[in-house]
Amino acid sequence: MKRPDYRTLQALDAVIRERGFERAAQKLCITQSAVSQRIKQLENLFGQPLLVRTIPPRPTEQGQKLLALLHQVELLEEEWLGNETNSDIPLLLSLAVNADSLATWLLPALQSVLVDSPIRLNLQVEDETRTQERLRRGEVVGAVSIQSQPLPSCLVDKLGALDYLFVASPTFAARYFPNGVTRSALLRAPAVAFDHLDDMHQAFLQQNFDLSPGSVPCHIVNSSEAFVQLARQGTTCCMIPHLQIERELANNELVDLTPGLFQRRMLYWHRFAPESRMMRKVTDALLSHGHQVLRQS
């Protein structure tokens, strides 16, 4: 059985996390040549490349599996040894989360864990359709995703759903939709997407108004909070989680443009199995709060 030296795995992990050999060497307090030698040793052991040497480097499929193994071992070491050997160094937990969860329910869910437990969070923001890929690649140990099926050697639980409403300010609605939300009016109304892969707005319009993707003007803004600001100031219409804008809807700063029509995104919590004690705390906190504030039907 091939048993890697975990120093070599840590070198591989550092190259991926630090996005290059030079910064990985600085992180590990060794020379860049030593980093290269450790990775070459690991590649020789498995008889195949573990890194695609692009800028930044990325792991091969086998490299992803080894990184996932490393992160599981690190968490299980914490499970068995606790913090006896590194009592002054909080445990690092890398999680992949979608921006809308981060802007609404996720931080309140983790409050008790952050207060009571010696951990450092590394929250990697990614679209909920792609967070599971970060777990697959071994970049994180847990992910909030819309995927209901677990990866091999992983666990999954349902968190609940975010319901997205199509909203705008009253002034925007009066300007662009004086006769209601129609197909022709939507073609002129500026919208906003999180990035070029965010298709929620386009999917909503296609499903309900038969508008083809790319047919409406659309800003790109990488911030969930900015969606609310853009809508409130009357510059765009957009899809925003109801949970995020309850106050704005109640005081009429924003209006639901299509009452009864919405997009529902069911969210699931994925993590490696078996869970460490600390990850179990994170799981319990996320599930408990998620089941309280997210739609369960």
Swiss-Prot record:
Residues 21-40 bind DNA. One of its GO terms (molecular function) is DNA binding. It holds the Pfam family LysR_substrate. Keywords: DNA-binding, Transcription, Transcription regulation. Residues 4-60 form the HTH lysR-type domain. NCBIfam families: argP, PRK03635.1, PRK13348.1. Homodimer. Belongs to the LysR transcriptional regulatory family. Controls the transcription of genes involved in arginine and lysine metabolism. This is HTH-type transcriptional regulator ArgP. The lineage of its organism: Bacteria, Pseudomonadati, Pseudomonadota, Gammaproteobacteria, Enterobacterales.
